[in-house]
């Protein structure tokens, strides 16, 4: 990874497209339940960062493709690191819903 790759911000819109193409993938919203209720990307599962260890309830297989987002990208970056430490091998930090241009559910 180059220095410039590190600076590149995840693109939530591209990440959602990749999620939609991935068979058996899980879209994780790691914001608080209150934030999730205020509007979330359709089909996403709410597993707040503080309870990320409960991810096994939605992704039992460690090879499951996980697409992780939050509000701005900071918590999703942290959650992605934690998921990798837990042994998940296909973790994708897609950034923050603040940049999302698609439909949201409430």
Predicted regions and their residues:
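Short, surface-exposed ligand- or partner-binding patches at beta-edge/loop junctions that are enriched
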Residues: 69
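Rhodanese-like catalytic fold shared by cysteine-dependent sulfurtransferases
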Residues: 2-18, 22-25, 33-65, 74-106
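N-terminal glycine-rich beta->alpha transition that marks the start or flank
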Residues: 29
């Amino acid at each position: 990874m180059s220095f410039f790759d590190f600076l590149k911000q995840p693109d939530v819109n591209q990440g959602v497209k990749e999620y939609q193409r991935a068979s058996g993938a899980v879209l994780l919203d790691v914001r608080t339940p209150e934030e999730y209720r205020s509007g979330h990307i359709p089909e996403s599962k709410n597993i707040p960062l503080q309870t990320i260890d409960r991810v096994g309830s939605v992704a039992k297989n460690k090879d499951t493709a996980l697409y992780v987002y939050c509000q701005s990208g900071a918590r999703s970056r942290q959650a992605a690191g934690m998921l990798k430490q837990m042994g998940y091998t296909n973790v994708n930090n897609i950034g923050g819903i603040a940049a999302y241009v698609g439909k949201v559910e409430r």
